[in-house]
Amino acid sequence: MGAGAQEPNVHKEAATAELTIRQGADGSFSLWSPRFGEGFHSRRGALREARETFLAPSQLERFSPGQRLTVVEVCVGTGTNLALLLEGCAELGLELEWWGLELDPAPLQLALAETGFRSQWQSQTLATLETLSERGCWQQGSGQQSSGQQSCGQQGAGSGRMLWGDARQTLPHLLEQRRGQVDLIWHDAFSPQHCPQLWTAEFLGSLADLLADGGHWISYCSAAAVREGLRLANLNVAALATPNPGPSSGQQQPSWSGGTVASHQHLATSVLWRPLSSMELEHMSCSAGEPYRDPTATANAADILHQRRIAQAKALSLGERRTSSAWRKRWGLQQGC
């Protein structure tokens, strides 16, 4: 999971030193961040999560060979999702236009320095990731210079560009260029409890503005507040199928849901996702469904969480929302769901 927006003036050297290498149940490379108290991937493993949560629901096969596929990845982290996407597009003959929103270059650098990570990918995939890490972009063909940036390397099919920095500040730049044109958004930030900056109703609304009519927003996250934020952005929301078998994720992925998919269009039931259940809809209407807010796109995590607690208390006092404990009791769920 890519590092999301952090507090101002954080020394990246210190953050890098904190990252530790982990291995998931599938044996794939991953990292752990003590700062956020979370792994970059679920306990299932990075490769399995990338395939089941992001690649499979994207249904790349619905795009024709030679067609351009525009993808935005929120928090790139180790580059595992991107690597799998690169190889999937190459296999299907798709021209990938990729945009990454990422604060910290360290996770990708650490991954590329590890044999365990490199052994997972084809040489062309590694060359593209290396070019992205070194130059912040890749470009098929001439390696032409773009927007005053340094020349992009001639690696991989299509093109890719990393927008470094706080995603809340770089997203407007992307909106200027790709509003209503994005086929897929892969949202892989740290969980809302630890990185609420990238799960606010305002941020989700801007991402929704990027989506093409048939575009899909996809994430591991099943949080009621996030789903409510997507609903407020006028997106149709469905639940991803629960991965089975395998241990549950440590990334806010309850046993009854494998994540969330959202779109401007109706999401017909499939083997990959289903309509939200009555239990999940009630979850959105209780205290847990109070969305995260950041109207200035500058608030830190503590302030966002504090303001949400105030909003939750107000909604409860006015009878606008039920308590989450009452919801859990009604559905026989354990604390923390």
Where are these regions (language model features)?
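Conserved beta-strand signature within the Rossmann-like core of class I S-adenosyl-L-methionine
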Residues: 184-186, 213-221
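SAM/dcSAM-binding transferase cores
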Residues: 17-22, 260-337
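Class I SAM-dependent methyltransferase Rossmann-like catalytic core
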Residues: 4, 10-69, 78-92, 109-112
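A short glycine-rich, Lys/Arg-flanked "PGG" loop and its adjoining helix->strand segment in the class I
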Residues: 197-214
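Conserved Class I S-adenosyl-L-methionine
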Residues: 227-258
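A short SAM/SAH-binding and catalytic strip from SAM-dependent methyltransferases
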Residues: 183-198
